[in-house]
Amino acid sequence: MAEFLDSEAEESEEEEELDVNERKRLKKLKAAVSDSSEEEEDDEERLREELKDLIDDNPIEEDDGSGYDSDGVGSGKKRKKHEDDDLDDRLEDDDYDLIEENLGVKVERRKRFKRLRRIHDNESDGEEQHVDEGLVREQIAEQLFDENDESIGHRSERSHREADDYDDVDTESDADDFIVDDNGRPIAEKKKKRRPIFTDASLQEGQDIFGVDFDYDDFSKYEEDDYEDDSEGDEYDEDLGVGDDTRVKKKKALKKKVVKKTIFDIYEPSELKRGHFTDMDNEIRKTDIPERMQLREVPVTPVPEGSDELDLEAEWIYKYAFCKHTVSEQEKPESREKMRKPPTTVNKIKQTLEFIRNQQLEVPFIAFYRKEYVKPELNIDDLWKVYYYDGIWCQLNERKRKLKVLFEKMRQFQLDTLCADTDQPVPDDVRLILDSDFERLADVQSMEELKDVHMYFLLNYSHELPRMQAEQRRKAIQERREAKARRQAAAAENGDDAAEAIVVPEPEDDDDPELIDYQLKQASNSSPYAVFRKAGICGFAKHFGLTPEQYAENLRDNYQRNEITQESIGPTELAKQYLSPRFMTTDEVIHAAKYVVARQLAQEPLLRKTMREVYFDRARINIRPTKNGMVLIDENSPVYSMKYVAKKPVSDLFGDQFIKLMMAEEEKLLEITFLEEFEGNACANGTPGDYVEESKALYQLDQFAKHVQEWNKLRAECVQLALQKWVIPDLIKELRSTLHEEAQQFVLRSCTGKLYKWLKVAPYKPQLPPDFGYEEWSTLRGIRVLGLAYDPDHSVAAFCAVTTVEGDISDYLRLPNILKRKNSYNLEEKAQKLADLRKLSDFIKMKKPHIVVIGAESRDAQNIQADIKEILHELETSEQFPPIEVEIIDNELAKIYANSKKGESDFKEYPPLLKQAASLARKMQDPLVEYSQLCDADDEILCLRYHPLQERVPREQLLEQLSLQFINRTSEVGLDINLMVQNSRTINLLQYICGLGPRKGQALLKLLKQSNQRLENRTQLVTVCHLGPRVFINCSGFIKIDTSSLGDSTEAYVEVLDGSRVHPETYEWARKMAIDAMEYDDEETNPAGALEEILESPERLKDLDLDAFAVELERQGFGSKSITLYDIRNELSCLYKDYRTPYTKPSAEELFDMLTKETPDSFYVGKCVTAMVTGFTYRRPQGDQLDSANPVRLDSNESWQCPFCHKDDFPELSEVWNHFDANACPGQPSGVRVRLENGLPGFIHIKNLSDRQVRNPEERVRVSQMIHVRIIKIDIDRFSVECSSRTADLKDVNNEWRPRRDNYYDYVTEEQDNRKVSDAKARALKRKIYARRVIAHPSFFNKSYAEVVAMLAEADQGEVALRPSSKSKDHLTATWKVADDIFQHIDVREEGKENDFSLGRSLWIGTEEFEDLDEIIARHIMPMALAARELIQYKYYKPNMVTGDENERDVMEKLLREEKANDPKKIHYFFTASRAMPGKFLLSYLPKTKVRHEYVTVMPEGYRFRGQIFDTVNSLLRWFKEHWLDPTATPASASASNLTPLHLMRPPPTISSSSQTSLGPQAPYSVTGSVTGGTPRSGISSAVGGGGSSAYSITQSITGYGTSGSSAPGAGVSSSHYGSSSTPSFGAINTPYTPSGQTPFMTPYTPHASQTPRYGHNVPSPSSQSSSSQRHHYGSSSGTGSTPRYHDMGGGGGGGVGGGGGSNAYSMQPHHQQRAKENLDWQLANDAWARRRPQQHQSHQSYHAQQQHHHSQQQPHMGMSMNMGITMSLGRGTGGGGGGGYGSTPVNDYSTGGGHNRGMSSKASVRSTPRTNASPHSMNLGDATPLYDEN
């Protein structure tokens, strides 16, 4: 068992060697012992003994035959025990007495740790106790190290052998050797130090507890038994007793076994998987097969000897991997021709498969050491392709084998069934399985064909499968019974004792055949084909003349290979023979027969294979933009060139085009249609026809008899039905998938190609002068690199770092002013820059780097490069420095590394820029090693940018393909194993060594660190690292050992070839070559000496005749080794020569892309971009031009104009000449300077500035102006562009700049669509727009339908906005938000209008009259909004997420069925807001199997459901749950019964405003509805409208209705219970609305109030609060005629409401039944409310107190807090001073302006106090009783 801690309880001075964490753990253990044994507190020696009992892992080998084996922690670990480990510390005193009596020796009794025992006691009692991490770890240690002998099995010999390798050379003191046990063995043996191995904290914790090599099998035994004896020591082996006098110990009562904690209980599964600690990982490590072969999706399996599978597979791979063309064009023709493989490739593929499958050799090994068998046809990429296709072949073969077994079982079942009754004929619906079916299955070559065969099998035999399985089950049971009877009979012959001794466990199968049939009974197949087959229609189908197989052969060969067998009677006459109760007429029989024949044709594998080949070759697509696509797809879109495409062959798609099209389709920008019509075969005249029509002709009989023509017609219909309904739609799905996969493969190849270019670069090698011999500049051991990283922000300091030759950071420098300018006019800035340059110069002089690299962050890198070059030039002169290059390199890798977990762990204290600098320097030292830093468990290598579409390919595939590049490159370069152990930078490359992987590499590294020794030769990979033979053969050639560094440090034989690419299997040949080259005699043979000499003079190898040597080797049976011998010669010439491409400077284009962060795809000539004008350029006049200058006199103002700069304010001619002489003339304007968005400077020549002639560019543009330009030239050397802003160029009139259109571009359709769009715009302009109104109300907007909907989209639920109606001038529309994206539009009719622009004196919704807009909102819309919110907050409400063409009922039905599946006992129901009918809620419920849908309509009176009105959700649900079984009418869609159309509205009754108002439940009103993006209903048109004020928020309390007289009831004013706020905004929270003193419907048309208030002008945020003194005023101070702005509603004057006195208020939500009985006007309503008020107030006083306390805490929380019991004052206060308005609203909730404290809620109206979900009260809102028992 591995050690628990590094220390084995040494003295305190020994503990100093432990790290901090280990010291803490040791202290915990000491404290535990101290607590449990206070009497021995001062006895340190006793403490050491106790600690040894717990954590000492010193191994002891025991020879008593108890047989410890390797079921312990690791495969090579011995059982490590203390001298008394064999005694369980849980033994009681009497147990010790018994053991001592039997053993005859005195046993030392250990004390038990009380704290650890307390854990056991608590757990055994079943109590859940919180145990800290330390206690858990100690408990696990106790469980692991205190197990008895019986819990451990036998160890293998290999475990004993491996255990020795793990022990270190350090031993304890010599005195320990004299302490022996009874058998004379030393107690203390070797021990070793252990260092933390895992960087991850959780994995290190696991190592601390279990040791490095713990085995998960050890922990499985802890979970085997549920019960055990309380003491394991109670039972003991009889062999330990003395003689036969053994006593039997009574067993203690069994009790629940303590649940042992394993590693799986402590660590998360994701952590175990990340660290490769699962059982599967352990198995992979142990198996002697390359790790990647084990991890392949289809593991590599050997081929049986004598099988021809490899020949078949090689042919298959050659055909499908190297010859078969892709459907789309993935390679250019020249590349495709270059990649074509000759037929000789088949043998090379077969040999490769032999290596892979039978010899388990990985691809890199084959590519490097079996070249003779694969070259020249197959390179390493081809070998990986063979490896990949081998997986597909194995998977295909396995599936074919399973299907073949199914075929054989079915054929045997058919044989048994027919043999049971040989007299009966074969039924018509039975198709016998023939040998041809097995042949067809054997000929399957692809997964698609296999799927076809499988579907054909299911079509014909699926109905027989249950019976076949039942018969097989019956046979198996019968065989078991017979076998049992035979055993019993045989046992009876041998006697009863033998019979009793035979115990055979019986399977838990029920032998009852009836039960078997019941268990196998499946759901009846109710498909049309199954119904028709049962009705006997399959017999009729056999009379159509050809079997499906025969017709498929005709179709394949494209001629009538099989003649049609024609019936002598017509189909109608024949159909009469098949009439049945199911099919009463011949038409029904014929219709069924057509379906059966068509279905059989569609499932015929040969037909589908033929159709697939033809369709994939000839398929075409149409592409059309959607409405959004027509607008959003511009010339910068990747699919612009294919915006309109007609009949484009899919074979013409190139590269990743289809992924781009799919992305546009997913974004609803394009519609891709695969045409079902495609070309047939060419006719005699050369013009192909339609393929489907040609297919019909192959099923026709060329005769003219009537009944023949009838049969021909039926056959043609069958063919058309089969192809167009089933075959072609299926092929379209396959084709889409194939095109997508091919485009993904293109992206993968692009990604790997990019990584290949990055990894193929060799470490930088400076070119020092030949005569430069200074030792400090030597590059033999490597180079020093200075890396510099900066941020374009000048306020961020730059950093540079210098690496040593090993890659460590030796020093760094902070440069805060390196980006500043040396020639700056700011003297301080200049001095700072020079100081940084001096520091950098001193730094370079001290560190002497071989090269300086700068991160390509921006163009500032070029300035830094110039500064450093100047420094280095000075150092060359003054310090005799060699020429040092300064390079600018890509910094993408450095930036990702700086933010990666690896970078964080490597440099925890470094800032990101310093990490970047270190990564830049290391990248120059070795790009492969630096890129491998991102190859960790988090797969950060995927963060690099390889391709714009890399996110569109599966992550696993991309990671696998990138790994192949690392494998190839690591195999080419090799890995120094000893250097890797010393320097962790190369650790990540170990997993890419051939034969290894993350798991095997991790184990190898662990062993090397444990042994703490260097590998001296490759043989130690087997002897020390325990690699198996297969893995060793694969990896040994790629692991190099620097033999020169070993020197004299080892006595072992040093093999110089271990430092070369020569594989150990060819060492003898290399030695032979060296001996022959040195011309040694056989007697004088010294291979080692010969090799050393040949390495010093490798030119002597050129004299060898390697071809003759190869022939001799082949003659001796070693195979062809010609290429290998030449490789050995090259390797001996230069050991492990680096074949990577030397570093080269970036080209001008590469540097341009790096510094601008652009690519040729993102920045190109012709692109339209935006630019900012930075200045103007002029061409100064030269001497001759000045002499011939001719100033112009302007007649308009009698002034003179300069002929060059066109300045025209010179009063005298002499001043023009003075203008020239003073050199003040800038010259003639030549162009405009601009700066692009990416920072590049640009220039617009004056001729390209405009289509018209421009003489002065300053008249056209100004500095800092943003303009659109088109790039017409890119100068990559000067990092500048030339642009044009001419209208003709921007519109690209001549089609010379925009991306080239596709060859199949549909210009005709594009023109038609553009014409439709322009016509629609013209019609929209001509359409009559709504009349703008002059209505002073914060919720009124002069906006169109679309504008209002867009405005309300972000508003809270229940927000309302009123707007002009497009119906007529005497109509308004009230739009309120029902739910997200669902809006209801209510038509409001006006009467008594003074003019077209004013508000009517009376407003009507249906037959109900309202006085003003406030009353509509407060009495009609707000109650509905509150009712809707109560439903939305109900727990069984589901948001309406329906999009596109989905049906909301279907969505709810799917949701209900999912819930029903989870809990079938309940009747589930849900509400959702209806999009089809806004204002209604869909109630869907699932009683049994059919989902029912009904509508609940929100009304001002409550909820209308099944013609009844309910005031609360509770009452609605209570009634619904009692009457849900009552018959209901089917809910109609949007119709007149639900929505009253505007043109069918009943005329209003002629009643005055003071007459009674109908509040009945059926009061009609006109309602329309819409959702976002929809079209206004009932004539509501979208038109361009003006501004507006503010939407009315239902979260605002209505404090009064403004009237113009004091005769209105309730003239006093009441205040809401909200806190004060004077800054309301749209959707404001908890802010009451106070209307202005101006009555809305009496608004005169006055000049000072003619402007409609604008919404959104200086609107404060909802969260802003202000005091009562913060008020704003608009208009006159008195308030009359003033129009308040949205943020000025608290304004002063008499316009405010909320002055003194009134106390009458009206409850928003009185019970609808009471209101219906009381015919009251507004005054009577006030009185009635006052009468009801005391009854309600008393019963709800405590409730309001609770609510007041709750809302005082919750009020600022959410946007829909609405903590209000709504109270309305009916008084219209026109007088009163500045006491009104928001500022004076009292903060105290539930207090009115008159000082009356009144409750706002009643039992009859729960909605009057809405709560948010954050409130605890909302948890109980609504009836929580389910339709059925929820439990």
Curated annotation (Swiss-Prot):
Please name the GO terms of the biological process aspect recorded for this protein, alphabetically: follicle cell of egg chamber development; nucleosome organization; positive regulation of antibacterial peptide biosynthetic process; transcription elongation by RNA polymerase II; transcription elongation-coupled chromatin remodeling
Which residues does the UniProt record annotate as the domain SH2?
1329-1440
Q: What is its main location?
A: nucleus
Query: What keywords are annotated for this sequence in UniProt?
Result: Chaperone, Coiled coil, Nucleus, Phosphoprotein, Transcription
What the entry lists under SMART domains is as follows: S1, YqgFc
The record, for CDD domains, names:
S1_like (cd00164), SH2_Cterm_SPT6_like (cd09928), SH2_Nterm_SPT6_like (cd09918)
Compartment list: Nucleus
Q: Per the record's keyword annotation, is Transcription included, yes or no? A: yes
Task: Give residue spans, biased composition: Acidic residues.
Answer: 1-19, 56-66, 85-99, 164-180, 223-240
Start-end of Polar residues biased regions:
1565-1575, 1631-1641, 1799-1818
Give a GO molecular function annotation for the protein.
Answer: chromatin binding
Q: Which residues lie within the region annotated Disordered? A: 1-99, 117-199, 221-240, 470-501, 1531-1587, 1602-1716, 1730-1831
* Entries under Pfam families matching the protein: HHH_7, HHH_9, HTH_44, S1, SH2_2, SPT6_acidic, Tex_central_region, YqgF
Q: Name one GO cellular component term.
A: transcription elongation factor complex
Coiled-coil stretches are: 7-59, 467-494
Locations of Basic and acidic residues compositional bias?
45-55, 119-140, 151-163, 470-482
- Assembly with partners or alone: Self associates. Interacts with RNA polymerase II. Interacts with the FACT complex, which is composed of dre4/Spt16 and Ssrp/Ssrp1. Interacts with the exosome, a complex with 3'-5' exoribonuclease activity which is composed of at least Csl4, Dis3, Mtr3, Rrp4, Rrp6, Rrp40, Rrp42, Rrp46 and Ski6. Interacts with the DRB sensitivity-inducing factor complex (the DSIF complex), which is composed of Spt4 and Spt5.
The record's comment on protein family reads: Belongs to the SPT6 family.
Q: What is this protein called?
A: Transcription elongation factor SPT6
Give the organism the record lists.
Drosophila melanogaster (Fruit fly)
